[in-house]
Amino acid sequence: MKGTSEVKPMETHRKLLKPLVEKRRRERINNSLEKLRIFLSQTLKSEKLKNPKVEKAEILECTVQFLQSRKLLPLDREAVDKEYQSGFQHCLETTLHFMNSKPDMNGVTKELLSHQMSSCKPPSDAWSPTCAPLTKHVPSLSYQDSTPHLVSNSISISPTKTLVDSHFTYQTFKTWRPWV
């Protein structure tokens, strides 16, 4: 008798919880479909997708057609390269602006970073989405991580800074963990 009375509250709890879980799942699906409908209506300029009452199956069919058409389109390498170059140039300009706004930055460090960034500027006639090889690097040695650092012919300029020459080898440092 005792076993059956303990099972009933659990079954009741599951029966009450199941509709709530299903309702949340349907809400997530509907929210995602609505976002997809809006994205596709803006991207495809489709009149039928502008209607908020469009069928879910129609949204999914348009999505499949859109993805298939994107797969069949040839990749415009020149446009991709120009977009990459534009983003790269924007990052360089933002970094230079940041460096120039920091009056407390060491003059040698600022000069080395500016030199490095100028060597990364792509030539305008033959652009490929790669940066020139690093010539100087100023790592902070306040802690060590597991990512490989380019190290060779190091010249110490302060207890926490190191200048690195243009011939690099990979050196992996021990991972810093706060709980160790």
UniProtKB/Swiss-Prot annotation:
Induction of the gene: Not induced by Notch-signaling.
Tissue pattern of expression reads: Expressed in the presumptive midbrain-hindbrain boundary (MHB) as early as the early gastrula stage (stage 10.5). Expression in the MHB continues through to tailbud stage. Also transiently expressed in the eye anlage at late neurula stage.
Entry-linked InterPro entries: bHLH_dom, HES-7_bHLH-O, HES_HEY, HLH_DNA-bd_sf, Orange_dom
Q: Quote the subcellular location field of this record.
A: Nucleus
Q: What is its quaternary makeup?
A: Transcription repression requires formation of a complex with a corepressor protein of the Groucho/TLE family.
Top-rank taxon: Eukaryota
Q: What is this protein called?
A: Transcription factor HES-7.1-B
User: Mind listing the GO molecular function terms for this protein?
Assistant: DNA binding; protein dimerization activity
Q: What is known of its domains?
A: Has a particular type of basic domain which includes a helix-interrupting proline. The C-terminal WRPW motif is a transcriptional repression domain necessary for the interaction with Groucho/TLE family members, transcriptional corepressors recruited to specific target DNA by Hairy-related proteins.
Provide the Gene Ontology terms for cellular component. Answer: nucleus
What keywords were assigned to this record? Developmental protein, DNA-binding, Nucleus, Repressor, Transcription, Transcription regulation
A Pfam entry, by short name: HLH
Nucleus recorded as keyword? yes
Keyword DNA repair on entry = no
Domain Orange: start-end pairs? 84-116
What function does the entry list?
Answer: Transcriptional repressor. Represses transcription from both N box- and E box-containing promoters. Demarcates the prospective midbrain-hindbrain boundary (MHB) region in the neuroectoderm in early gastrulae embryos by repressing transcription of a number of target genes.
Ranges where the bHLH domain occurs: 13-70
Q: What's any GO biological process attached to this entry? A: midbrain-hindbrain boundary development
